[in-house]
Amino acid sequence: VIALGMSVATVYGQDEVTAINTGAANFLTIMPDARTAALAGAGVSLTGNENAIFLNGATIAADKNCRGGASYTYVPWMRDYQSGYSLHTLGGFYKIDEKNVILAGFRYYNYPKLGVLETGGESIRPKELAAEVGYARELIKNLSVSATFRYIYSDMGKVGNDRGASTVAFDLGAFYTKAIARMEGASWSAGLQVSNLGPKIKYPKSSESLPMMAKVGGSVDLPFSQMHRLMMTADLGYRLAPSDVQAVNVSAGAEYTLAEHFMFRGAYHYGDKEKGDHSFATVGAGMNRYGGHLDFAWLFASDDCPFRNTFWATLGYSF
């Protein structure tokens, strides 16, 4: 049982995709969808994403192109490290009117069977989940804000704990966008999000901090013609808690859109390896038609990175 507990601890903390051996519910830091993953997690200032509730809910209030949408994402996490880890994500939103938006999301993180207890012969299979609802509003022209409530449940499969534990957390977001003069359709945007503000998860024999994060980011959208469009974005993040992994990270990437229907993406994430935040590169592609879209992303990292060669697949629809 001790060995199995160590096995869980080894993978239990992944910050921004990442930190190791610290904190609880770190599946919340895994990039939630393929577009965001292809941009190395730089999503705090991007519009047009059904998964905005996980990134910055305020961005969706500023998006005038659709009334609602939903998507599903599958991530076989750490597939090179050990099979069986996976993240399933559902995200969506609905605009009540031109200024007010309701958002919803659900994430389920599955572990492989890690072994069998000596007593009772029960298999050990930890699992974690989060269910969340959010509200976003356009306060004034170009400026939006959001708030998200999140319920988190963590069950480490009786490894050192008699039962699962739960807690709640909140996110706060803000978003500003403005048109660029003398270039039709061009704009720049800035976003801010503070995520997972809440109490520790209290297990029967211990308590663990949530992966609290602050992010600020910016992007520029440049439609050169109806056939060619370029978007560039960057995020600066700071891990606020747990205290032993406080560190700065940076993500930057670009998205090229061809003929309005085909997207190609690439990005790089720089992190502090000593804090468990590995640096990595990502690439991805997507296509959309009649409101539906399909996106894919792939992560490249060094051989000592446990989540190298992870991929994301997202299927979504907006109207």
Spans of model-derived segments:
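Subset of outer-membrane beta-barrel
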Residues: 14-319
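Bacterial N-terminal signal peptides
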Residues: 1-7
